[in-house]
Amino acid sequence: MGSVSNLVSPNICHPAPPCLTSRSNKFPWTKPISGLLFYRSVTPIKRCHLVRRSCVVSASLTGNLGRLKRNVQDFTSMNYWVVRDYYRLVESVNSLEPQIQSLSDEQLKAKTAEFRERLARGESLADMQAEAFAVVREAAKRTIGMRHFDVQIIGGGVLHDGSIAEMKTGEGKTLVSTLAAYLNALTGEGVHVVTVNDYLAQRDAEWMGRVHRFLGLSVGLIQRGMKAEERKFNYSCDITYTNNSELGFDYLRDNLTSNREQLVMRWPKPFHFAIVDEVDSVLIDEGRNPLLISGEANENAARYPVAAKVAELLVKDSHYKVELKENSVELTEEGISLAEMALETGDLWDENDPWARFVMNALKAKEFYKRDVQYIVRDGKALIINELTGRVEDKRRWSEGVHQAVEAKEGLEIQADSIVVAQITYQSLFKLYPKLSGMTGTAKTEEKEFLKMFQIPVIEVPTNLSNIRIDLPIQAFATARGKWEHVRREVEDMFGQGRPVLVGTTSVENSEYLSELLKEWGIPHNVLNARPKYAAREADFIAQAGRKYAITISTNMAGRGTDIILGGNPKMLAREIIEDSILSYLTSEVLADNIDDDELSQKVLSKIKVGPSSLALLARASLMAKYVGKSESKSWTRKKAKSVVTESLEKSQTMDPMELQNLINEQSEMYPLGPAIALAYLSVLKDCEAHCLHEGSEVKRLGGLHVIGTSLHESRRIDNQLRGRAGRQGDPGSTRFMISLQDEMFQKFNFDTEWAVRLISKITNDEDLPIEGDTIVKQLLALQINAEKYFFGIRKSLVEFDEVLEVQRKHVYDLRQLLLTGENESCSQHIFQYMQAVVDEIVVGNSNPQKHPRYWSLAKLLKEFMAISGNLLDESFSGITEETMLQSLENLHEGSSIEMEDLSLPHLPKPPNAFRGIRRKNSSLRRWLDICSDNLTGSGSYRTLINLLRKFLGDYLIASYLNVVQESGFDDGYIKEIERAVLLKTLDCYWRDHLVNMNKLSSAVNVRSFAHRNPLEEYKIDGCRFFISMLSATRRLTVESILQYWSSPMESQELFIS
């Protein structure tokens, strides 16, 4: 079933390359292969086909030439050989199917424990891959009624091998993920299945989770708004479903917490294996936007409204220049003068009265941040629209004052400015996984980027059925008016035929413009965009988008992850009927922003006609819901009411109608709402399936779903995602792109619109008529390729810069986790190391191994040493002067007989309880002293003297600290918590400041390119210098804080950390 083994020709004249006769976790083509070697390896195949071509040329030449060319390309494609190799896995899985089918449910469940025992005995996952896949296939068939096709087995193998599986829309990627997720979860180290939003994560956890739970694995779900305890439990499960942003923020939050009980991930190894759904969206589209956690900064919010008024005074091109491609503005001399005059300041860049940043942000808000395109205003707040998905991200804010500038432009309350306290890019986040895989319908065009950035190949998995979608030629218009009018006509034409239509737009503004246009012509339709009144019903709209006469206008969100099934999705439609009948009796809440009053809304479309038995069951379920609602005073929230319906629908999947009816009869006096809803759902579902099957056949006869793209995107891949909505699983369908030369993309990337207008004028005098053909398509393709290269350059630069920061971040986060989760003694060891390191810096910074101590800065050395100790050394070192220390060093240098075991220097005080302190210190400092002891001071006659001095002062400081801690009377647990708190707080404080400095540096180094210096190399050098300085400052503040804490009066002890 579902086999595509006919793709493997029986007439192959050349065996598979040796490197492809067995699979491994990393494929050989991830390494650089010279073009010469590659073409030599495939030359025999080409020869073979040339021979075959000579045999068939005498037949119908015209009919065979295209197919022959395609066959040659198949056999010379590396992808062909890889897929061919995976058919060995398919054969193994298929051969095991009869044996697995014969197992009882209990025997099938017991396979999980058996696999884990075999792993413990030394077998590898590869040894049991085929059998595990066969077990999952059978479990899916028994639990959710779905059997993996052969091509889906290939997809599972690709995922397990740590590659990206490109599978076209409707090929069942969600089901494919169960294979690799189950196999890798057997190790007990945790598997993350990552989706692009909460809805898909919840859907997959509930739907595919049934397969895993049936086999005895635990399944977790991470959702926005969950508490730390819930997150911790769900991350501890064998398989965890989450979305990419929640995963990233949980990682960052775990590295900000000061309480080990608040850690939610599986530390010390939170990452094992991830399957990323829509991997191109996560790693490429979202790759330009790093994840940021911000804290409030002390900024003057009153400046933003003033700057917004100044921006309104300034005129584009006269007072400032705009670079659309770079999203940057530059003030002219005239603009600077006018701004300074309006603000009554002599210099916009005055450090004591800085206005430049506020004015530049106000101009950016004016030119680049458009309402209903980049953001919407709701409840007095400016909410970001993700331009790639079309969804509102209400928890996200633009950084560096841009969001405040937008709020000022809109006259909204200005929220507190922010500074970054933690950040990471998605590229760096997913590189933390030892094994990473992904799946999507559109990755092949970005294969080079995946290979270069992640060393992950893209494998194109064959479709189960041939693709018969028709992609109509692109139509180009000189004006936007002409484009929208032709879109309207095409929608009207398709509506007249009864074909469903999906229109893709790039913004809320465009979707609502087209909606108004269709309303004027009386064409009923649904709108799906970021506005909450539409977004809340995204899945419902997409479920009906394949029905006869359905017209759906959508932004880029386009319901990714939800298939558009011709004739409608019977399960979604049946659920909608149940909810319409039940919810109003259980809750008094209604959907905010009700859209059903619009007479042109297609919410109901043509209502599914349910049979008499279904109507009776619906009436009974409604009656019970009415009774339950009355007894509860309709106090349930809509969310709780929907969860009751969801639980009931899940029950319908595990019980047959007879069992449900018996349950209702047994509990009739208790008004068993759940069984009644489940029974009604099964009956309604049967009616919906019959209706959708009939309507789907009718839609197929008419030509299937028609997709209209109203603008080219900045990547061919995103255009292909929209095209992929039509023609799923061998269905008929068609697509058409209509573009205007006034579209923003042409302005942003400096397309030669004058050339295009001249070309159009040669063909027609009507500027509202379209042109199409190879000439214009080639130009548009070149434009998209340039855009792809540009954004690839941005992502590449972001990754390269973040790789520098990632080294530093890993050091800080590893240290943090060691302090947070390590033994109590590790905190003391770090305190001792920091004390010795700070003393080393003081001594080395004020001495010279080539000069006599009388030429050292002994007064400064002594002052700095006393300053770090608070009041701890006031009594013992009160009589020590520069002369005393000089005399001690001279005596020591002349005597040369004192050893460090004496733990003292002439004329200087002996450490209290010295031997006890040093014994404890030596165990912790051994590695530190081995590494840096004799390499800090350089060469010279007085090198040994410097080493003795810094070791003595370090010993003295540590011994004094241990003495005062012991005399405090506090127990060890309290002392270690104080140490941990000081260590974490100082580290966080300086890491936060370091991130601010590094962000400033990343902007500043670009200017150095004008001096022919490499910005990345400059960033590495200065960033390293900043990091070393940060670590030094962290150590010093830690030592100062901990010593000041213990040396201050007990009634006023505080952590002196700003």
Swiss-Prot record:
The keyword Chaperone does not apply. Disruption phenotype: Embryo lethal. Residues 1-58 form a transit peptide. InterPro entries: Helicase_ATP-bd, P-loop_NTPase, SecA, SecA_CS, SecA_DEAD, SecA_motor_DEAD, SecA_preprotein_X-link_dom, SecA_SF2_C. One of its GO terms (biological process) is protein import. The keyword Chloroplast applies. ATP binds at residues 167-174. It is found in: Plastid, Chloroplast membrane. Its EC number is 7.4.2.4. SUPFAM superfamilies: Helical scaffold and wing domains of SecA, P-loop containing nucleoside triphosphate hydrolases, Pre-protein crosslinking domain of SecA. GO terms for cellular component: chloroplast membrane. It is a peripheral membrane protein. Keywords: ATP-binding, Chloroplast, Membrane, Nucleotide-binding, Plastid, Protein transport, Transit peptide, Translocase, Translocation, Transport. One of its GO terms (molecular function) is chloroplast protein-transporting ATPase activity. It catalyses: ATP + H2O + chloroplast-proteinSide 1 = ADP + phosphate + chloroplast-proteinSide 2. It is an enzyme of class 7 (translocase). HAMAP family: SecA. Belongs to the SecA family. Involved in protein export. Probably interacts with other proteins to allow the postimport or conservative sorting pathway for inner membrane proteins in plastids. May have a central role in coupling the hydrolysis of ATP to the transfer of proteins across the membrane. Cannot substitute for SECA1. Part of a second Sec protein translocation apparatus. Interacts probably with SCY2. NCBIfam families: secA (TIGR00963). This is Protein translocase subunit SECA2, chloroplastic. The lineage of its organism: Eukaryota, Viridiplantae, Streptophyta, Embryophyta, Tracheophyta.
